[in-house]
Amino acid sequence: MPLLRLIDCGCYDGQDKVDLLADTFLADYWRQDSLSAGIEQVRLGSFKTKRPPEIVGSGYVVKSLEAALWAFEHSDSFEEGTLMAVNLGDDADTTGAIYGQLAGAYYGESGIPAHWRQQLAFKPQMETLADQLYQAGWANQ
């Protein structure tokens, strides 16, 4: 999902949420035919004008991405947005995973509630893997 990846990169770069979600964010990057019509509509901000029940957390990638971006735009914390995303129902785990990737990049580990982080199964293994992925990314630069 190149659109989500580029928004993630903007998060890591410290971009403001308003800028990340603007239809002008990296607008020069996209060629006329580089995104499917549905993803292009999401890139242009379809999530900004819709509300539930128009926003749905289905397993269809366009709808899931739209729902995750809707929750990201309409929340002020990792916790609030996560609850908004998963409470849309339907394929809540997919929407929550997409939201979590984006919001995790934006808010960082410290933005995830401590009581959630403490409950993670396999936390040491995930931290080790995350560190390895981070180092591998820098090694390829």
Predicted regions and their residues:
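Accessory "access/gating" subregions that flank catalytic or transport cores
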Residues: 4-89, 136-141
